[in-house]
Amino acid sequence: AAPKLMMSSTPQWKDKSLWFYKVNEDYGSFAPLPEAQKKVDELIKGKKTEMEKIAVLTHWVADNIRYSGISMGKGEGFTLHNTQMNYTDRCGVCKDIAGTLISFLRMAGFEAYPAMTMAGSRVESIPADHFNHCVAVVKLSNGTYMPLDPTWVPFCRELWSSAEQQQNYLPGVPEGSDLCITPVSAPENHYMRIKADNRLDANGTLRGTFTLTAERQSDSNKRRIINTRFHRSEEHT
């Protein structure tokens, strides 16, 4: 254990939220791009509900914008790179992946904004700069904001990783926001069931299949294991 000292000249979280919103809008981080608009139109074609559209856009970004931590030098920080750079390079860190999703959502007609969070740690009540991760929020038809994290959901079915429960985040929205927190998800929402169907042949050989059924974090963990091992086996082939 060690003491932790937090200091800030920002009076309240709403002030930081408004600043984060303004710095990215002024820079033009989410300006539309014709080539990207074509991709968005292609992805949402035939999708009827807002959740269908949000899901297909989130998963395309998660699966196609590769995580690559390359420093761009002076000027890095809370300003998200613009749509043209992200869509052209198809790689970047969390803020680039989140920024691409925000741009895609806006081109699909949604209100979407960036949000700051601290992956794996608690955010204290003092409105200081203690964030290490960038995510997105989208405004639903009922007026509420839904957090999305494309960095943590490649090749899985979730839109916000279940590993990020009770995680604080601060949206950069035009009306300003207080510090938010993701809800707890009950253990029964993350089940894994294994069904074995085996038969013993006359010659003593055991043959059969195992069927795995899983949801949320259990499902994501298994998909990650399978995907990682598949790529490793390809590298050694």
Task: Describe the function of each predicted region.
Residues 235-237:
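Conserved small/polar residues in nucleotide/adenosyl-binding loops
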Residues 95-185:
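Hydrophobic/aromatic-rich core segments of domains that either
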Residues 1-75, 202, 209-211, 215-230:
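Secretory-pathway-linked proteins and extracytosolic
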Residues 37-38, 73-82, 118-120:
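Short, conserved phosphate-binding/catalytic loop or strand-edge motifs used
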Residues 35, 129-133, 191:
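Short, solvent-exposed loop/turn segments at the edges of secondary structure
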Residues 31, 48, 73, 85-92, ...:
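Alpha-helix capping and helix-loop boundary segments enriched in small/acidic/polar residues
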Residues 179, 183, 188-197:
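Long, His/Glu/Asp-enriched segments that create or flank divalent metal/ion-associated functional microenvironments
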Residues 54-56, 62, 68, 81-92, ...:
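Active-site-proximal cofactor/substrate-binding loop regions of enzyme domains
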